[in-house]
């Protein structure tokens, strides 16, 4: 398997599959994918600029889990099994690096069905 084959396989993965891959690599090689602390300090200095990309995080499914699963499927385009895994495993990141408008729209749809959502 060539490097290009590996990259192509990664490109075809969903966010959920990529998250599982990162966790498996961390466990297998005893490393962490977290950014070094020095980098986080440098980013904090530029935080005065307005943020343009946001992460949408499902904090809790609330009481109406079935409606939340349907909303997650609609928002992410995932299958029933994957959407259920995300809802059952909350808190989970639904989408990363989306516009403020898209993040607020997702938050509104999920809040409408009773989910607790964070936009970071």
Curated annotation (Swiss-Prot):
UniProt keyword terms in alphabetical order: Ribonucleoprotein, Ribosomal protein
Domain of life of the native organism: Bacteria
Coiled-coil features, chain-numbered ranges: none
Region forming the signal peptide: none
SUPFAM superfamilies from the UniProt entry: ClpS-like, Ribosomal protein L7/12, oligomerisation (N-terminal) domain
Pfam families, per the entry: Ribosomal_L12, Ribosomal_L12_N
Single Gene Ontology BP annotation: translation
GO cellular component terms attached to this protein's record: cytosolic large ribosomal subunit
Molecular-function annotations in GO: mRNA binding; structural constituent of ribosome
Gene3D superfamilies for this protein: 3.30.1390.10, Single helix bin (1.20.5.710)
InterPro entries for the chain: Ribosomal_bL12, Ribosomal_bL12_C, Ribosomal_bL12_C/ClpS-like, Ribosomal_bL12_oligo, Ribosomal_bL12_oligo_N_sf
UniProt record similarity statement: Belongs to the bacterial ribosomal protein bL12 family.
Function: Forms part of the ribosomal stalk which helps the ribosome interact with GTP-bound translation factors. Is thus essential for accurate translation.
Subunit structure: Homodimer. Part of the ribosomal stalk of the 50S ribosomal subunit. Forms a multimeric L10(L12)X complex, where L10 forms an elongated spine to which 2 to 4 L12 dimers bind in a sequential fashion. Binds GTP-bound translation factors.
Protein name, entry field: Large ribosomal subunit protein bL12
Source species: Clostridium botulinum (strain Eklund 17B / Type B)
């Amino acid at each position: 398997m060539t490097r290009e084959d590996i990259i192509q396989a990664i490109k075809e993965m969903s966010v959920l599959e990529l998250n599982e891959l990162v966790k498996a690599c961390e466990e297998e090689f005893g490393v962490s994918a977290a950014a070094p602390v020095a980098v986080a300090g440098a980013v904090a200095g530029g935080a005065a600029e307005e943020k343009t990309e946001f992460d949408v995080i499902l904090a809790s499914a609330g009481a109406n889990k079935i409606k939340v699963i349907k909303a997650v499927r609609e928002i992410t385009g995932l299958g029933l099994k994957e959407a259920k895994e995300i809802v059952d495993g909350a808190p989970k990141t639904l989408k990363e690096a989306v516009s403020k408008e898209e993040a607020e729209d997702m938050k509104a749809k999920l809040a409408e069905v009773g989910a607790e959502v964070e936009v970071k």
